[in-house]
Amino acid sequence: MGAALSSQWARLLGEATGDEARGARVVAWHVRAADSDWVSRVWLGAQNDSGLPAPAIAVDGSEGWWVCFALPPQPSARPQAEAVALLRELIRSWLNQGGAGVSDKDAAAWRFACWPNEAPADGVPVPRQVGPDRWSAFVAPDLVPVFAESPWLDCAPGEEGQAALLNKLQPIPAADWGRLLAASAQGASGRALQAAGDGEAPAASASTALQGDPRAFLLSVMNDPGVELALRIEAARVLLAHG
């Protein structure tokens, strides 16, 4: 691919190498063709329910879709586990608000790709030729029904059109990402308390969180073994950043 498309991917993925590239700057959620109606639901849910930039939509060239989210820019890629865990939770929430009835088990089986960690050597995950007369490509949201039964292009897409679609993918603001992480951590802490029953340590943690002290809440998340490790790490990062 030429300069226009490569520059758009460079904007999103950066030029980090080695350890700095081992993580996520763009996370793509894979959707089966049979669940094509989910693509539009999530595209709308990200914007209307959570106030996030619109994700990019791509046919994968074989069996379904990629719904792509650009993460907040920072010197190094975000931890892959953190990014996938939060987006998995958000996507399930958006779908279930529309009555999809996605269970924890269903969501756990979803497939995600994290770029640049899993990106091809040329740094261009989409579009690509994935088989004879089968190409992955970005598509406009209103074209999702057109590709529902055949999620591919028969020939290489035009570079300028692909670059224009990718140009619309903007990173999630850092403040919004932090807000969503904190909400997820608080929910996880509450679930841990419920699972623990009358245990004194979780009860103390939840009590502190409910008092409305942000620093105390972050400390409780960081020290709560019932919270996912990625969220505990994020709480520690926020504490270090703000003193």
Question: Could you say what each language-model-derived stretch is?
Answer:
Residues 22-34, 75-199:
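DNA replication initiation modules
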Residues 1-63, 70-89:
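Signature for HUH/AEP ssDNA processing cores
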Residues 64-66, 234:
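Generic detector of isolated residues embedded in canonical secondary-structure elements
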Residues 195-234, 239-243:
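Charged, helical or coil segments that form electrostatic protein-protein
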Residues 41, 178-181, 189, 230-234:
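Generic alpha-helix signal with a bias toward terminal, lower-confidence helices
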